[in-house]
Amino acid sequence: MGFREKLKLYVITDRRLKPEVKSVRQALEGGATSIQLRIKDASTKEMYEVGKEIRRLTQEYDALFFVDDRIDVALAVNADGVQLGPEDMPIEVAREIAPNLIIGASVYSLEEALEAEKKGADYLGAGSVFPTKTKRDVRVIRIEGLREIVEAVSIPVVAIGGINVENVKQVLSAGVDGIAVVSAVMGASDVKKATEELRKIIEEVLG
């Protein structure tokens, strides 16, 4: 499975919903192809310890592993990449610091998408496709905005924001390479089953 294909089901951790390591294992068992460690309120040491465990699991399941924002932690745990938002380290600086990391850019408009591609992002996390409880005050681009981004860039696009089993087919119809989810998996009573259900639909649409 190549890099682009490994973006098809991208699961993001949220400790408000589930503890990271156990839920990541369950998501990987269910067919997650990428994992992102997102912790906003932990010490660097804790992020490192959790990151090491997730790195081990993602290697075991041949999945990609990304760390949100923290390039230092990504390098320390030998992650595959880092996800950077508009308020994080600039893409071109991150590339200088960590030339071998895959850099994902979170974008919320067509202009931001084009700028991120120009600056050297390897893939885009584009959203929010729908309103979401995970992030407040987020811009909603809907399917139309998502499709505009997909058609304008040549790098892979992963859709994010309010995606679940009910709307995933609609999202995939925009031509994205994959979907990123938080609550659709981490908020489920059965993480493995929720991941399996999403993966099944993705395989039906993307193959």
From Swiss-Prot:
EC number: 2.5.1.3
Gene Ontology cellular-component terms listed: cytoplasm
Gene Ontology terms: biological process: thiamine biosynthetic process; thiamine diphosphate biosynthetic process
Glycosyltransferase in keyword set: no
Positions that bind 2-[(2R,5Z)-2-carboxy-4-methylthiazol-5(2H)-ylidene]ethyl phosphate: 132-134, 162, 182-183
GO terms, molecular function: magnesium ion binding; thiamine-phosphate diphosphorylase activity
Binding-site positions, 4-amino-2-methyl-5-(diphosphooxymethyl)pyrimidine: 36-40, 68, 106, 135
Alphabetic keyword roster: Magnesium, Metal-binding, Thiamine biosynthesis, Transferase
Residues binding Mg(2+): 69, 88
Signal sequence annotation: none
Enzyme class: transferase
Pathway: Cofactor biosynthesis; thiamine diphosphate biosynthesis; thiamine phosphate from 4-amino-2-methyl-5-diphosphomethylpyrimidine and 4-methyl-5-(2-phosphoethyl)-thiazole: step 1/1
Catalysis performed (reactions): 2-[(2R,5Z)-2-carboxy-4-methylthiazol-5(2H)-ylidene]ethyl phosphate + 4-amino-2-methyl-5-(diphosphooxymethyl)pyrimidine + 2 H(+) = thiamine phosphate + CO2 + diphosphate; 2-(2-carboxy-4-methylthiazol-5-yl)ethyl phosphate + 4-amino-2-methyl-5-(diphosphooxymethyl)pyrimidine + 2 H(+) = thiamine phosphate + CO2 + diphosphate; 4-methyl-5-(2-phosphooxyethyl)-thiazole + 4-amino-2-methyl-5-(diphosphooxymethyl)pyrimidine + H(+) = thiamine phosphate + diphosphate
Cofactor: Mg(2+)
One Pfam family in the UniProt entry: TMP-TENI
Cofactor note: Binds 1 Mg(2+) ion per subunit.
Domain of life of the source: Archaea
Function of the molecule: Condenses 4-methyl-5-(beta-hydroxyethyl)thiazole monophosphate (THZ-P) and 2-methyl-4-amino-5-hydroxymethyl pyrimidine pyrophosphate (HMP-PP) to form thiamine monophosphate (TMP).
Family note: Belongs to the thiamine-phosphate synthase family.
Protein name as annotated: Thiamine-phosphate synthase
Protein species of origin: Pyrococcus abyssi (strain GE5 / Orsay)
Chain's gene name: thiE
